[in-house]
Amino acid sequence: MMMMQSRKIWYYRITLIILLFAMLLAWALLPGVHEFINRSVAAFAAVDQQGIERFIQSYGALAAVVSFLLMILQAIAAPLPAFLITFANASLFGAFWGGLLSWTSSMAGAALCFFIARVMGREVVEKLTGKTVLDSMDGFFTRYGKHTILVCRLLPFVPFDPISYAAGLTSIRFRSFFIATGLGQLPATIVYSWAGSMLTGGTFWFVTGLFILFALTVVIFMAKKIWLERQKRNA
C-alpha cells in the first residue's frame, strides 16, 4: 500500500515537472505567452488595481479567462496580492459575476497550491513561500488544529496561499481542505466584490473595516470553542 502511494506521488511529481518545463518553454519560445506573463507580473508589481483592470480588459472576450489565469499565477507566486484581482473583477464584471469568478478561480488556485505541496514536499514549498512564512503557517496549524483552514480563511490579514501550501504538507484530506476554503473565503469575496463594484474612498474602507471586525469576532468565538474542547479533553 505504501509502495503504491509512493509510486503515485512520483508519477504526480514527474507530471508537475513536465508541465513546469512546458510552461518555461512556452514562455521562452512563444511571444504571446512571454508577453502575458511579463505584463501580469508588471501589473502586480505596481500594486495598481486600475492597471490590472486595463490589462484584463485588453483581452476583450477572453477577459474572464485571463482573470482566472491571473488568479492561478498569483496563487503559485504567493507574495502577489489576490485582492487586486477581486477588486478588478468586481469593477469589470459586476459584484455577482465578478465575485463568482474570483471565488472559483481562487478555489482553483488553492487546490493547485495544496496539490503542489502534497506532491513536491516541504523543500519546494519553502522556496515558493519562504521558510519564515511557512513556519508561521505551521504555528496556526499547531494552535487551531482541524479548524485552521476555516479560521485562517476568515482572517483577511493571514496570507491565503501559504496556508494552502502548508495544508498540503499536513495529513488533512483534500475534501476537508476544499470545503473549509470555500466556506471561509466566501464572506471576504462577497464583501470585497460588493465594495469593489459600488464603493470608493472612505466608504470602501469603512465597509472593509466592518468585515475585518466581523471576521475577528468569528475567530475569537471559534478560538474560545477550541480552547473549551481542549480543556474537556484534558480534564
From Swiss-Prot:
InterPro entries: TMEM64, VTT_dom. Keywords: Cell inner membrane, Cell membrane, Membrane, Transmembrane, Transmembrane helix. Pfam families: VTT_dom (PF09335). Residues 1-13, 86-95, 198-202 are periplasmic. The chain crosses the membrane at residues 14-34, 65-85, 96-116, 177-197, 203-223. Residues 90-199 are annotated as: VTT domain. One of its GO terms (cellular component) is plasma membrane. Residues 35-64, 117-176, 224-235 are cytoplasmic. It is found in: Cell inner membrane. It is a multi-pass membrane protein. Belongs to the TVP38/TMEM64 family. The VTT domain was previously called the SNARE-assoc domain. As there is no evidence that this domain associates with SNARE proteins, it was renamed as VMP1, TMEM41, and TVP38 (VTT) domain. This is TVP38/TMEM64 family inner membrane protein YdjZ.
